[in-house]
From Swiss-Prot:
<feature type="region of interest" description="Disordered">
    <location>
        <begin position="263"/>
        <end position="335"/>
    </location>
</feature>
<feature type="compositionally biased region" description="Low complexity">
    <location>
        <begin position="1010"/>
        <end position="1022"/>
    </location>
</feature>
<dbReference type="InterPro" id="IPR041971">
    <property type="entry name" value="Gawky_UBA"/>
</dbReference>
<feature type="compositionally biased region" description="Polar residues">
    <location>
        <begin position="1052"/>
        <end position="1061"/>
    </location>
</feature>
<dbReference type="GO" id="GO:0035195">
    <property type="term" value="P:miRNA-mediated post-transcriptional gene silencing"/>
</dbReference>
<comment type="function">
    <text>Required for gene silencing mediated by micro-RNAs (miRNAs). Silences both polyadenylated and deadenylated mRNAs. Required for miRNA-mediated translational repression and mRNA decay. Not required for miRNA target recognition. Necessary to initiate but not to maintain silencing. Promotes mRNA deadenylation through the recruitment of the CCR4-NOT and PAN complexes and promotes decapping by the DCP1-DCP2 complex. Dissociates from silenced mRNAs after deadenylation. Required for completion of nuclear divisions during early embryonic development.</text>
</comment>
<feature type="region of interest" description="Disordered">
    <location>
        <begin position="1052"/>
        <end position="1102"/>
    </location>
</feature>
<comment type="similarity">
    <text>Belongs to the GW182 family.</text>
</comment>
<feature type="region of interest" description="Disordered">
    <location>
        <begin position="148"/>
        <end position="227"/>
    </location>
</feature>
<dbReference type="InterPro" id="IPR009060">
    <property type="entry name" value="UBA-like_sf"/>
</dbReference>
<feature type="compositionally biased region" description="Basic and acidic residues">
    <location>
        <begin position="208"/>
        <end position="225"/>
    </location>
</feature>
<feature type="domain" description="UBA">
    <location>
        <begin position="547"/>
        <end position="588"/>
    </location>
</feature>
<keyword id="KW-0694">RNA-binding</keyword>
<feature type="compositionally biased region" description="Polar residues">
    <location>
        <begin position="485"/>
        <end position="501"/>
    </location>
</feature>
<dbReference type="InterPro" id="IPR015940">
    <property type="entry name" value="UBA"/>
</dbReference>
<feature type="region of interest" description="Disordered">
    <location>
        <begin position="1318"/>
        <end position="1368"/>
    </location>
</feature>
<feature type="domain" description="RRM">
    <location>
        <begin position="1117"/>
        <end position="1189"/>
    </location>
</feature>
Length: 1384
């Protein structure tokens, strides 16, 4: 009673005035879950005497505890102990904590409360005899770790038990925080029973109220006994009553969460009874407490050394300590919500600051705490804690806002170790059982797995607590080790332990650690840790808030108008570096500090931010850091890939200044070393500028903010760092050195930053693979591939951005006013391509830098007027007129031709990420090296009309190219016709590429006309050119855009006409022979395989773009049919194609929606293309294009390599065989097995009847062959082996899988097709060409059935093999040879 009297206010003291009626009764908590509750409550009983009555019952323990209990405990009416009302009735134990309360060990004493349905076993475990709350009471037996005096509550063992018990209860616990027992309390006691104030509530635990109180889960609740009870009653939930509890708005949630949490925590708690309060106890508690308040948990923390805790309170709760020390368990400093523990961490004083971060975060998490997800609470999804107690569903439930202290007994630290765990732990640690979660973080890692077992028992404490482990857990700062409590967390290094507390340490450990508090994540681990730790701890011990607030940096920043809280966070994060802090603040201001302060909650927030830096996103506050961050980018835009943070949400990233990211990055790959998870983290880290950006994409607002804020502009330091990293990247070949000479837009800088970040992470991931160790190779490889894709995407985006920017500058060299506009355009494009993140970083636009490819778009001002006038430059610089409109996002292209269409294509491509080739370049056209030309092609592809416009633009080949204007190119269609033509001047149609200009001209129009080109999507992989247009395909350049065509054509044309003329300097790789030269591009096609598919409409967009009707000589005889459906009958399609001329080969890739037909002549192919384009077949409109050889090769390489056989006549057999083999080899999988060469299959196994195609074509055997091995389908093909004679296609079952596809036709004679497994279906010996399998014309001896479908048997249904007209064997052989070359 005395203590109650001492309490200064209703809140503060749980023992509210006796005279007060204890509003609690007046508003008994809705019985919530306990029917008995009401009786127990006996709200009527509240006459103010409850308090003393409770005390009496408690055996002289300050009834106050109970009183408060009643205050709100009472409310619950269904108290475990039959809280107040019951108390009156008598069973003290039942009432309130009594039993539990009794004795600090409480272990046995554990609450006698059984009545409330919670029976506390001696173990302190709540037996819960039907705890009203459903056990809300988790019997939070904190089993304190220490059991120290503080632990009053159940002894440590009690904790464990309690934990278990609690956990059981936990389910309900939430519902009723009051149920939560003081963690320490062995028994689960209704929180109501327990005194809020008293923390003691357990009654068990120590007569020393304060101890109890510390421990008391209600502790937090303690605040405002009356309020609590009143609140409880009024609120109807424990939670409610502790509004302070971190906005228990979450209460409901918390309750829900609590239960879940309880469960999860239980396990934790159980695992380490000793674990310090934070340990299992808290876990337990957390289950309950979290249930309840978090504070309760805090109690739990308290348990760990509640006293210590109070002692540790240290800065946080100065007032509090005294009360605690006062042994007024009930004393509430108003932070009770936060829970004493919080108190410890920062219950009162700064709880908002640091603790909050902790507390709030935890609160946020609180609900979530259990789950680790909670930790992420803000993140919510993250569950990073993953490892953490997954069982704690609540965490997710709760939400970022769930500020309630959180489940973990520690309130903020909801055992959740899980919550927190996620942080660094997530990575491997997390599994730690979450336990580690908290503290461990860094250790966690250690503990991580290892610890997990032990859970480090201290979840919170974790690790650091290590040292203090038990003690500290959260609440105790004292244990310094404690994550929370102490920032000291001595082990800063462990810091992790600090998980929370440590910001830096965490980082170290894994960002995670930082995640929470580690504001400093970025900052040096140790330092930060220290600083942060202090701060973090909520105690703000080291760099505690007081120190920060007294610092000059703080004053200066505050005087500059930044919010104090933000300044404090920023300084913590920046390690008191005022410059960095100012950068962060400015950046945040744009976000309204949203990201930062998004959780206003307190340092935690910034700590998280840090983390986010390291792990993935401020926004996450709770670091998203899990491995996923790396994934984050995927979801939003390419940039997201960059920032693992994307997960966290755009805000945080943005908040995180690029600088921070950069800094983080500079620190090295924090996570990478860890391994895949590290990689994940690193990806988060990788965010860098990009992170902001990516998030921006994620959160448009964020990007907007960035754009809005000059803050977002990188600081000088950031830029310097970025410059250094760019130089390194240039040395590494990731970036062209030209980027150094180009002006960079802000967007480009962001992209570069992301690129660098990804490169760094890629390297780290690769190193981790090299290093080996306990790294999951698969995960690392996935991460590596992800990084590579991101890098490629970023390069493409950078190229596109620079191209647009440069283009715009060119258009208005003098006025860079348009730059913003330009950027907008890019944004637009980007949006198309999913590069939204690019948009909005305009602030950086001013920055200049170029990527080598980007150099194509040399800023007019930048290079000098002379360059602009040089045709070459103009080539490099896209024509602004057209480009700006159509191509705002287009990647830089070599030719100056505008790539209007290209733009659209480009964006698609980018979004698809298809174009892979050039690091920077878009890789528009497969064949061409020059990007610009692709636009022409694209134009063609996109619309027939466009080509015209493109043509018009370039009509005059001779016409000079003017930088700001689209180069008109010459009117002359074929280069041959234009004497003045130069590579850069030609605007001819892509067809001009063809060695024979005439054809090219002819096709150029058709190509343009052909809608199929429209989808230039095909990303032909060429980096330079999108090159969907196959029209020009012939030119290696020509692929590029039509506009470019002139150029490409110029180049190609000449090339075609005279090999001597090569592509422009940078594009030499694409030889003049687009088919072959482009071959290299096909690699570019990387995206291509996809790309070409993608561009399904665009078709392969081979360089040739057969639009031109196969203008390219090489490609002209090929016909690419796109937009097919798997329902189309292969044989029917083949027959349809054969109507326009004999097919040298037919490769249906119906599953990919395309088919390749090779005619003996280009004329036939062109004819077929014109006839079949837009032809309606089965429920689809076929788009026919004339791909270049390169495109064909790319397709065949990337698609199931089951080119239908290039059938070679059986006779040529021997000959062909040889060729076939080689060709096949090239195709390897391609089922070609020319007759007899099964071996050709790439496997060679089916050598089959070599030349003897007809021979009997033992080829069949190939089945064995490895045909199957290399291509499944191929095998089939092999079987099909054409051997004409036997036609036994037997097809050894060979790839039956493909076989269906393949249905090889045997030679005309047998005509067997091998569909289906090895059966030769023979479709009758009839060699009807129709048969899919036999489909080969009768003549053709060989039908190679190529199953083109290595991917899909169905696809191939139509036998690929197409028999060649018999008369043409020689041609066929030649063609086969070519085909094989192409395949190669």
């Amino acid at each position: 009673m005395r203590e109650a009297l001492f309490s200064q206010d209703g809140w503060g003291c749980q023992h509210v005035n006796q005279d007060t009626n204890w509003e609690v009764p007046s508003s008994p908590e809705p019985a919530n879950k306990d029917a008995p509750g009401p009786p127990m409550w006996k709200p009527s009983i509240n006459n103010g005497t409850d308090l003393w009555e409770s005390n009496l019952r408690n055996g002289g323990q300050p009834a106050a505890q109970q009183v408060p209990k009643p205050s709100w405990g009472h409310t619950p009416s269904s108290n475990l102990g039959g809280t107040w009302g019951e108390d009156d009735d008598g069973a003290d134990s039942s009432s309130v904590w009594t039993g539990g309360a009794v004795s600090n060990a409480g272990s046995g004493a554990a609450v006698g409360v059984n009545q409330a349905g919670v029976n506390v076993g001696p173990g302190g475990v709540v037996s819960s005899g039907g705890p009203q709350w459903g056990q809300g009471v988790v019997g939070v037996g904190l089993g304190s770790t220490g059991g120290n005096g503080s632990s009053n509550i159940t002894g440590s063992s009690g904790v464990a038990t309690g934990s278990s018990g609690n956990s059981s209860n936990a389910g309900n616990g939430w519902g009723d925080p009051r149920e939560i027992r003081p963690l320490g309390v062995g028994g689960s006691m209704d929180i109501r029973n327990v005194e809020h104030r008293g923390g003691n509530g357990s009654g068990a635990t120590s007569s020393d109220p304060r101890d109890i109180r510390m421990i008391d889960p209600r502790d937090p609740i303690r605040g405002d006994p009356r309020g609590i009870s009143g609140r409880l009653n009024g609120t109807s939930e424990m939670w409610g009553h502790h509004p302070q509890m971190s906005h228990n708005q979450l209460q409901g949630i918390n309750k829900m969460v609590g239960q879940s949490v309880a469960t999860a925590s239980t396990s934790v708690g159980t695992s380490g009874s000793g674990i310090g309060p934070g340990g299992p106890g808290p876990s337990t508690v957390s289950g309950n407490i979290p249930t309840q308040w978090g504070p309760a948990q805090p109690v739990s923390v308290g348990v760990s050394g509640p006293k210590d805790m109070s002692k540790q309170i240290s800065g946080w709760e100065e007032p509090s300590p005294p009360p605690q020390r006062r042994s007024i368990p009930n004393y509430d400093d108003g932070t009770s919500l936060w829970g004493q523990q919080t108190r410890v961490p920062a219950a009162s004083g700064h709880w908002k600051d640091m603790t909050d971060s902790i507390g709030r975060s935890s609160h946020l998490m609180r609900g979530q705490s259990q789950t680790g997800g909670i930790g992420i609470a803000g993140v919510g999804n993250s569950n990073v804690p993953v490892g953490a107690n997954p069982s704690n569903p609540i965490s997710s439930v709760v939400g970022p806002q769930a500020r309630i202290p959180s489940v973990g007994g520690v309130q903020h630290k909801p055992d959740g170790g899980a919550m927190w765990v996620h942080s660094g732990n997530v990575g491997g640690r997390n599994n730690v059982a979450a336990v580690t979660t908290w503290g461990d973080d860094t250790h966690s890692v250690n503990v991580g797995a290892p610890s997990s077992g032990s859970v480090s028992s201290n979840n919170w404490v974790d690790d650091k607590s290590n040292s203090t482990l038990a003690q500290n857990s959260w609440s105790d700062p004292a244990p310094v080790g404690v994550s929370w409590g102490n920032k000291q967390s001595k082990p800063p290094s462990n810091s992790a332990s600090s998980g929370w507390s440590t910001a830096a340490g965490v980082v170290d450990g894994v960002d995670l650690g930082s995640e929470w508090n580690t504001h400093g994540g970025i900052i040096g681990k140790s330092q930060q840790q220290q600083k942060l730790a202090g701060l973090n701890v909520g105690m703000v011990n080291v760099i505690n808030a007081e120190i920060i607030k007294q610092s000059k940096q703080y004053r200066i920043l505050v005087e500059n108008g930044f919010k104090k809280e933000d300044v404090e966070r920023a300084l913590v994060i920046a390690n008191m570096n005022i410059e960095e802090a100012a950068d962060m603040l400015r950046a945040n201001s744009s976000l309204s500090m949203d990201g930062w302060r998004r959780h206003d909650e307190s340092l935690g927030s910034y700590a998280d931010h840090n983390s986010s830096t390291s792990s993935g996103g401020f926004a996450g506050r709770y670091p998203v850091n899990s491995g996923q961050p790396s994934m984050s980018f995927p979801h939003n835009n390419l940039m997201n890939n960059m920032g693992g943070t994307a997960v966290t949400g755009g805000n945080n990233n943005t908040n995180m200044t690029a600088l921070q990211v950069q800094k983080y990055l500079n620190q090295g790959q924090h996570g990478v070393a860890v391994g895949p998870q590290a990689v994940g983290n690193s990806s988060a880290v990788s965010v860098g500028f990009g992170q902001n950006t990516s998030n921006a994409a994620v959160a448009g607002a964020a990007s907007v903010n960035i754009a809005a804020n000059t803050n977002n502009q990188p600081s000088g330091q950031q830029i310097r760092m970025l410059g250094q990293q760019i130089q390194l990247a240039i040395h590494s070949g990731f970036i062209s050195s030209q980027i150094l000479t180009q002006p960079l837009t802000q967007t480009t800088l962001n992209l570069l930053n992301q690129l660098l970040s990804n490169i760094k992470h890629l390297q780290a991931a690769q190193q981790s693979l090299t290093r080996g160790g306990n790294v999951n190779p698969m995960a690392v490889n996935v991460a590596i591939s992800k990084y590579k894709q991101q890098i490629q995407n970023l390069q493409n985006q950078i190229n596109a951005q620079q191209a647009v920017y440069v283009k715009q500058q060119n258009m208005q060299p003098t006025s860079q006013q348009q730059q913003p506009q330009q950027q907008q355009l890019p944004s637009v494009h980007l949006s198309n391509s999913g590069n939204d993140y690019l948009r909005g970083h305009d602030a950086i636009n001013n920055l200049q830098s170029n990527f080598s490819e980007l150099n194509i778009n040399k800023p007019s001002g930048y290079q000098g007027a002379s360059n602009q006038q040089s045709r070459l430059n103009q080539w490099k610089l896209p024509v602004l007129d057209k480009e700006i409109n159509s191509d705002s996002t287009e990647f830089s292209r070599a030719p100056g031709a505008t790539k209007q269409n290209l733009t659209a294509n480009t964006s698609n491509i980018n979004s698809l990420g298809l174009q892979n080739d050039s690091t920077w370049s878009t890789g528009r056209s497969i064949g061409d090296g020059w990007p610009d030309p692709s636009s022409d092609n694209e134009n063609k592809d996109w619309s027939v009309a466009q080509p015209t416009s493109a043509a018009t633009a370039y009509t005059d080949l001779v016409q000079e190219f003017e930088p700001g204007k689209p180069w008109k190119g010459s009117q002359i269609k074929s280069i041959e016709d234009d004497p003045s033509i130069t590579p850069g001047s030609v605007a001819r149609s892509p067809l001009s590429i063809n060695s024979t200009p005439k054809d090219a001209d002819i096709f150029a129009n058709t190509g343009k006309n052909s809608p199929t080109d429209l989808p230039p999507l095909s990303l032909s992989s060429s980096t330079w050119s999108f090159n969907p247009n196959q029209n020009y395909p012939s030119h290696s350049w020509s692929d590029n855009s039509q506009q470019c065509t002139a150029t490409s054509e110029l180049w190609t044309s000449p090339l075609n006409k005279s090999s001597s003329r090569g592509p422009p300097p940078g594009l030499t790789a694409n030889s003049n022979k687009s088919a072959n030269s482009n071959a290299s591009t096909p690699t570019t096609i990387t995206g291509g395989a996809n790309g070409w598919l993608q561009p399904r409409s665009g078709g392969v967009q081979t360089t040739n773009t057969n639009w031109t009707g196969g203008n390219t000589t090489w490609g002209s005889s090929w016909l690419l049919l796109k937009n097919l459906t798997a329902q189309i009958d292969g044989p029917t399609l083949r027959t349809l194609c054969m109507q326009h001329g004999p097919l040298v080969s037919f490769h249906p890739y119906l599953n990919q929606g395309i088919a390749l037909c090779k005619y003996t002549t280009r004329e036939e192919a062109n004819k077929a293309q014109m006839a079949l384009n837009n032809c309606v077949l089965a429920n689809t409109t076929i788009f026919a294009e004339s791909p270049s050889e390169n495109e064909v090769q790319s397709i065949m390489q990337h698609l199931p390599q089951t080119p239908s056989s290039t059938s070679s006549s059986g006779t040529s057999g021997g000959n062909v065989g040889g060729v076939g083999t080689s060709a096949n080899n090239a195709n390897s999988g391609s089922a070609a097995c020319l007759s007899g060469n099964n071996s050709g299959n790439g496997n060679g196994s089916a050598s089959g009847a070599g030349s003897g195609n007809n021979g009997n074509s033992s080829c069949n055997n190939s089945a064995a062959g490895g045909g199957s091995s290399s291509n499944n389908t191929i095998t089939t093909v092999a079987n099909s082996n054409l051997v004409g004679s036997s036609g036994s296609v037997s097809n050894s079952s060979g790839v039956t899988a493909n076989s269906s596809t393949v249905s090889v036709v045997s030679c005309t004679a047998s005509g067997n097709s091998i569909n289906g497994a090895g059966t030769a279906n023979s479709s009758g010996s009839k060699s009807s060409a129709n048969n899919l399998a036999s489909g080969q014309s009768s003549a053709s001896n060989l039908t190679n059935s190529t199953n083109s479908t290595w991917r899909q048997t169905s696809q191939n249904q139509a036998l690929q093999s197409q028999s060649r007209p018999s008369g043409r064997e020689a041609d066929f052989d030649y063609i086969s040879l070519v085909y094989s070359i192409v395949d190669d």
